[in-house]
Design a protein with these regions (language model features):
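Short, charged, intrinsically disordered terminal tails
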Residues: 164-165
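ABC family nucleotide-binding domain
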Residues: 1-130
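Conserved beta-strand-loop-alpha-helix hinge in the C-terminal portion
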Residues: 135-160
Length: 169
């Protein structure tokens, strides 16, 4: 019911990418065939099929982040806690992961609680809470806005507050 995406990946070094992802399913009494099907599907969606047999030391930071993300969302959790989930990703990989988050949210109503300093990443949310010095100082909702319009609102709030993005999101 709960998925975690850590900023520093937390993959097990002695397991392949495939095995790291499978860990989340292996405790759920799911058949090996179903586990394999789900891993292959998420691997394709996050563009990690070619690294499934690699160990973490053989992967780039972005690949590790995508494997860790796959492990967190493969169980279709009701809540995903994500700490800078796109921090180690290039723009293409970030978009793929954020689209997966959107898909989970829309299809099975998964809540994604994400910490980010990136306005682009935040623009995929339906609600953004700005925290400064440990206190909530603003909140905006996407509503019916397009992602571009919501992105512009995020930038406007940061600009109005007189800080840079690293201070506000």
């Amino acid at each position: 019911e709960l998925g975690f995406i850590f900023q520093d990946f937390n993959l097990l070094d002695t397991l392949t990418a495939y095995e790291n992802i499978a860990l989340a399913l292996s405790i759920q009494n799911i058949s090996a065939k179903k586990i394999d099907e789900r891993i292959r599907k998420i691997a394709k969606e996050l563009n990690i099929t070619e690294i499934l047999e690699k160990y973490p030391y053989q992967m780039s930071g972005g690949q590790k982040q995508r494997v860790a993300s796959a492990r967190a969302i493969i169980t279709n959790p009701k809540l995903v806690l994500a700490d800078e989930p796109t921090g180690a990703l290039d723009s293409k990989s970030s978009k793929m992961l954020l689209e997966q988050f959107e898909h989970l949210n829309k299809t099975i109503n998964t809540t994604i609680l994400m910490v980010t300093h990136d306005a682009f990443t935040a623009s995929y949310a339906t609600r953004v809470i700005f925290i400064k010095d440990g206190k909530i100082f603003n909140e905006i909702h996407k509503g019916t806005d397009t992602r571009k319009k919501f992105f512009d609102k995020i930038i406007d709030v940061v600009t109005l507050l007189g800080g840079d993005l690293n201070d506000a999101l």
